[in-house]
Each structure stands twice: as C-alpha cells, then as structure tokens.
C-alpha cells in the first residue's frame, strides 16, 4: 500500500460536501484503493453512517479494507456505484462482523456476478439489511 498523505483533508472536504458529520461523500474527489485503505484506518470516520464513493474504479482491495476496519461501527449505508469491487469484494463485505449496523448496500455497476450475489444471499452478517441494489451487474 502506498502511503496516502492527505486522507484527513479529504475526510474534512467530504464532510463539507455532505454538510453533516454522518455522511461522507467522495463522489467528486479523486479516490483510489490506497485512499480507501487509509480512510478505513482513520479515527475521523467513527461517526459516519453513510459512505458514498461512486465512479472511482475501487476494487476488492477497497472492499477488504472496509470489511476489516474497526473505524466504521456506525456505518448504515454504503453506496459504491460504478466501481469494480466484483465477487471477491462483495464476499469480504458479506462476511464481515465489523459492519454490524449496515442496512443499505448499493453496488450497481460493480462487475458482480452470480458468486457475489450468492455471498450476499448466504450471509449471516447482513440480517439487518433492508435495501440492496445490484442493478447493472452480471447477475
């Protein structure tokens, strides 16, 4: 992993864009797997309930960072439209115990196939899920 030096600045800007401290929107920021790995370790995101990162070509590496993070216990909604997390990334998120409050997953346009859909359907960790968007994938 490359060292990502300005994640705290990006987090501050993400809060400004969303105008509250419960939503982080990085839709208009330059964001990469390295940035996601840094964000997942940042203590500045503990209160985040909604995380939006669209169109950034994030891969399973980002999904794994989120799934292994101890810094997002309050996350309820995750929108990762137009990325590339794929079946492997979905599996990380479906199996994690570290996102206990997740209610909404929005993964349209993410190169997810039948295996990823099966991981979500079989997950014992997503009992509180009330909304799932998988449109425009290869299911």
Set out the residue ranges of the language-model regions.
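N-terminal segments that cap or nucleate solenoid repeat domains
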Residues: 1-51, 57
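Short, solvent-exposed loop/turn at the beta-strand->alpha-helix junction
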Residues: 4-8, 29-37, 56-64, 84-91, ...
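Compositionally biased, intrinsically disordered low-complexity segments
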Residues: 10, 48-51, 88, 93, ...
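C-terminal capping segment of individual leucine-rich repeats
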Residues: 17, 41-44, 68-71, 95-98, ...
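Structural register of leucine-rich repeats
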Residues: 22-24, 37, 46-49, 64, ...
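Concave beta-strand-loop units of leucine-rich repeat
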Residues: 24-31, 51-57, 72, 79-84, ...
